[in-house]
């Protein structure tokens, strides 16, 4: 019996000696996983984030009936009863996220490059592959609504990054989409010139004219058919932002705000003085 007990004790101690390091290793791994979290350098793709937003929006719309009714939800239900034709905000949000997800997939699949090569064919004669002006003017109106939506989405997405990484043909198309033929220019027409209007614009095939460039030019001959294409661009100067040019209602609001600010400042200063007087009296009595 004594020998058997000794063997059992040795066997148990041997097992404990073998299990002890295993427990320490497992505990060490748990501590490492608990307190050490490696930083992932890989950023999740935009399409995955959009899918997550769509799923959260749909889950929020389905579980909103289970949550307690809030004040905003009650007001939205009241307005929906009063205005049945008003659009649903949740549906608009979900449809907008689905649209962004679809445009992201189209942009990642290289559809924008296919459109640019199909309609504009950037010339390889230039160093930075610029689009020929005549091709740009002729083929840009041929873009469909889906193509323009993809172009606008690409502009909004790529403008957030480094502009030095953008290609010149994309910048040229972005510029034309934003500003048109004339671009953000202020002085283009000579005031003392007598030739026809199109020659003053360097003989470029413009189809619309900037009204600001022509308002001081008395020698410019504009045909009646071209008047419909005139774009009115108002030039803002310092004279517009004067006290005399402000309407009476705005003056009254500004004066009221200034009066209230002065009244609050005087009231706070008076309260501060009344608080300081007892402190001064206590110091005098103590002396």
Curated annotation (Swiss-Prot):
Its main location: mitochondrion. The keyword Plastid does not apply. The keyword Transit peptide applies. It is found in: Mitochondrion membrane. Residues 1-24 form a transit peptide. It is a single-pass membrane protein. GO terms for cellular component: mitochondrial membrane. The chain crosses the membrane at residues 250-266. Keywords: Membrane, Mitochondrion, Transit peptide, Transmembrane, Transmembrane helix. Belongs to the GEP7 family. Involved in respiratory growth and required for cell survival in the absence of prohibitins or GEM1. This is Genetic interactor of prohibitin 7, mitochondrial. The lineage of its organism: Eukaryota, Fungi, Dikarya, Ascomycota, Saccharomycotina. The gene is GEP7.
């Amino acid at each position: 019996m004594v020998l058997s007990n000794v063997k059992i004790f040795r066997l148990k101690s041997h097992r404990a000696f073998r299990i002890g390091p295993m427990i320490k290793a497992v505990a060490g791994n748990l501590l490492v996983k608990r307190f050490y979290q490696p930083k992932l350098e890989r950023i999740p793709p935009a399409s995955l984030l959009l899918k997550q937003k769509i799923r959260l929006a749909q889950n929020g719309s389905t579980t909103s009936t289970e949550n307690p009714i809030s004040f905003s939800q009650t007001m939205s239900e009241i307005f929906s009863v009063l205005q049945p034709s008003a659009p649903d905000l949740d549906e608009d949000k979900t449809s907008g996220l689905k649209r962004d997800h679809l445009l992201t997939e189209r942009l990642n699949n290289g559809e924008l490059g296919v459109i640019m090569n199909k309609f504009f064919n950037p010339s390889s004669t230039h160093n930075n592959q610029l689009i020929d002006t005549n091709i740009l003017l002729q083929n840009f109106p041929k873009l469909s609504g889906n193509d323009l939506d993809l172009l606008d989405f690409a502009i909004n997405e790529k403008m957030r990054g480094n502009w030095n990484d953008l290609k010149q043909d994309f910048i040229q198309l972005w510029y034309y989409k934003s500003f048109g033929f004339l671009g953000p220019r202020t002085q283009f027409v000579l005031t003392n010139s007598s030739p026809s209007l199109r020659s003053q614009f360097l003989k470029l095939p413009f189809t619309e004219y900037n009204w600001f460039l022509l308002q001081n030019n008395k020698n410019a001959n504009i045909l009646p058919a071209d008047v419909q294409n005139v774009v009115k661009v108002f030039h803002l100067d310092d004279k517009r932002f004067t006290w005399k040019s402000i309407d009476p209602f705005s003056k009254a609001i500004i004066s009221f705000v200034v009066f209230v600010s002065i009244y609050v400042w005087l009231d706070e200063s008076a309260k501060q003085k009344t608080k300081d007087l007892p402190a001064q009296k206590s110091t005098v009595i103590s002396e």
